[in-house]
Amino acid sequence: MTEITLTAPKRLRGVIQVPGDKSISHRSVLLNAIATGSAHITNFLPGADCLSSVACVRSLGVTVEQPHERELIIHGVGLGGLRESTDVLDCGNSGTTLRLLAGILSGQPFFSVLSGDSSLRSRPQRRVVGPLRAMGAQIDGRADGDRAPLAIRGSTLRGGQYELTIASAQVKSALLLAALYADGPLTLGGRIDSRDHTERMLAAMGVEITVSPDRITLHPPTAATAPVALSLRVPGDPSSAAFWWVAAAIHPDAELVTPGVCLNPTRTGALDVLRAMGAEIEIMNERLEGSELVGDVVVRSSVLRGTTIAGSLIPRLIDEIPVLAVAAACADGETVIRDAQELRAKETDRITTVAAGLSALGVTVEPTIDGMVITGKPDQLTGATLHSYHDHRLAMAWAVAALVARGETTIVEPAAVVISYPDFWQTLAAIQEDV
């Protein structure tokens, strides 16, 4: 399927089981691979990115069974049990796989090479390579380690203190995983205000890690604090649910329910923004599942107004900005997005590609160095031909826009959704009603 053409339906209704959370699915594989014992993972996200993590740990000697598409049994080999791969470790399109594995492999007594597809090989890696080198890691790559392939010769790693300069969960996680192999405690400060699934999972596995608002300290494991396999049900992904939240809010006749979604406070920025814009949102049945807060989210047709998305909100919704930009285009008034320069290091330069797509839909939008200014107006979207550029979140954001655009909207390269939401197009068709 090289393109898909959509028109606006009269009504949206449905209860949508969104895929398992992408971040937690990755970590369930990578952390259990180096734990002791076997872990049973259910509601795993079988998207291309998470399957890259599975393929890589298998190449490193870990046995991973997959009885069903969304179920894994991971037989951990312990902190010292990984084996040198005889081939390049192919991370596909997955920056999470590459960066978290860079942390783990930096402390192994063998040589590894991490690479991926053309998109991943073009994305900046010095943000993780630099801090790992500061811990003593021996990593080389193109552009002095800023581009994959990355060659890693395992070495003795040092603990100490490191100040993070960007709020990146991937960088933070890579350092924490490297610290499992360090000669002393690692303390992280600075921009630690990104999603915290790694910290939660390590603690649940028995690792000695302390977290405060401005510091994270991990102590290298002893025999008593080495990670133990953690079985879990992966909660629904809020970054995937956000497409349905926005769809319901901007459509004139909609009610969509997304049950069992992760409501970890580091991941609920999109809900906070939509509420600030006036969206009618109801959260029911909040509960703890494992170490994560989960709930059922109901969103109904709403009258939205412009807002500002900036500062500490950004790390809590960085992946949802493409679809929040669609919400902003349908709101009354101006929406300002700033402090989001991290968007330029995603699968595409999402500041440029989102602004170009909105402009094609008839929206007045001004891209800036770290975000954009969107002039919103209800009922202003006009169908157009939009490119995903192989970026899964762009493809889905443009599909949401098509639900309220006049005329036909054609999306080129819609198959990009396989990265994080393989069933997206089937779900989109199922919730549309033309009564």
From Swiss-Prot:
Subunit structure comment from the entry: Monomer.
This protein's GO CC annotations: cytoplasm
Signal peptide as annotated in the record: none
Localization, UniProt: Cytoplasm
Pathway membership, UniProt: Metabolic intermediate biosynthesis; chorismate biosynthesis; chorismate from D-erythrose 4-phosphate and phosphoenolpyruvate: step 6/7
Keywords per UniProt: Amino-acid biosynthesis, Aromatic amino acid biosynthesis, Cytoplasm, Transferase
Active site: D319
Protein name: 3-phosphoshikimate 1-carboxyvinyltransferase
Family (UniProt): Belongs to the EPSP synthase family.
GO biological process: amino acid biosynthetic process; aromatic amino acid family biosynthetic process; chorismate biosynthetic process
Group of enzyme by EC: transferase
InterPro entries in the cross-refs: Enolpyruvate_Tfrase_dom, Enolpyruvate_Tfrase_sf, EPSP_synthase, EPSP_synthase_CS, RNA3'P_cycl/enolpyr_Trfase_a/b
Gene that this polypeptide is encoded by: aroA
Binding site for 3-phosphoshikimate: K22, S23, R27, S168, Q170, D319, K346
